[in-house]
A protein has these predicted regions:
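Conserved small-residue-rich beta-alpha loop and adjacent elements
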Residues: 47-115, 162, 184
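A glycine-rich helix N-cap at a beta->alpha junction
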Residues: 117-123
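N-terminal Rossmann-like NAD(P)+-binding subdomain of aldehyde/semialdehyde dehydrogenases
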Residues: 1-57
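ALDH superfamily catalytic-core signature
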Residues: 116, 149-230
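Short beta->alpha connector loops at strand-helix junctions that form conserved
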Residues: 91, 96-98, 125, 145-146, ...
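A structured beta-alpha segment of the ubiquitous adenosine-cofactor-binding alpha/beta core
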Residues: 55-57, 123-140
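Short gly/ser/thr-rich secondary-structure transition/capping motifs
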Residues: 45-53, 123-126, 189-190
Length: 230
């Protein structure tokens, strides 16, 4: 199953897989089901005076064929959540998981095949060469999660076909701690956010900007929390 596949790829604990991979996808699916009818509804917009007597509205239509390229650090979450969004908008999808998670990719191949016809959703396993070949094809939209370096290559490939792109390229996440902070609670939450998934999270806190008067206490509490957990 998924827990075993992810553990085989990089040792992730089953409980952590539940918390960071499965539950977020269930929440995304439920949120989409609850709001999709409202999202699909056409929106009235203003009409230019030159077109007086007419009615204007925005209608939401599928892009067409979507390519989703997912990373290794959250191989289920960061593949399925974009898939939920793309399919709920009426698109067909091609999926390419990271080559660094072969066991998870194999699980996903079986999982996706059991749910969808290949004409609706198809998943390709394999090396980065497969991704490069896919990027040569005329997709209507490309969703990529990964590094800025590869993101530039994805954007350049998309430009050849005037495809739109969604690029999630990570970033820096500072924590700002002032003199009013509850240091015990702050340290506990920051250590959880920093070390979940062994720190391999795009929004994990990278550094803290802390009031000088709270620095010693913060370091003490952080060390104690890490020692108790690891």
């Amino acid at each position: 199953d998924l827990q075993n596949a992810i553990h085989a790829d990089y040792g992730k604990h089953p409980s952590e897989t539940d918390i960071t991979e499965i539950y977020p996808c269930i929440a995304e699916i439920n949120h989409t089901i609850s709001h999709l009818r409202k999202w699909m509804k056409p929106k009235r917009v203003g009409t230019p005076l030159a077109l007086f007597g007419t009615r204007s509205e925005l209608r939401f239509e599928p892009r067409g064929l979507v390519l989703i390229l997912s990373p290794w650090n959250y191989p289920f979450n960061l593949l399925i959540n974009p898939l939920v969004a793309a399919m709920s908008a009426g698109n067909c999808c091609i999926l390419k998981p990271s080559s660094k998670v072969p066991h998870t990719s194999k699980f996903l191949k079986t999982f996706i095949s059991s749910l969808f016809d290949e004409g609706e959703v198809a998943l390709f396993e394999g090396s980065s060469a497969i991704s490069n070949d896919l990027l040569k094809l005329p997709f209507d939209h490309i969703f990529f999660t990964g590094s800025p370096k590869i993101g530039k290559e994805v954007m350049a490939a998309a430009a050849q076909h005037l495809a739109t792109v969604t690029l999630e390229l990570g970033g820096k996440s500072p924590a700002i701690i002032d003199q009013t902070a509850d240091i015990r609670k702050t340290a506990e939450r920051l250590m959880w956010g920093k070390f979940i998934n062994a720190g391999q999270t795009c929004v994990a806190p990278d550094f803290a900007l802390i009031h000088q008067s709270k620095l010693a206490e913060f370091l003490k509490e952080s060390r104690a929390i890490l020692m108790s957990r690891f």
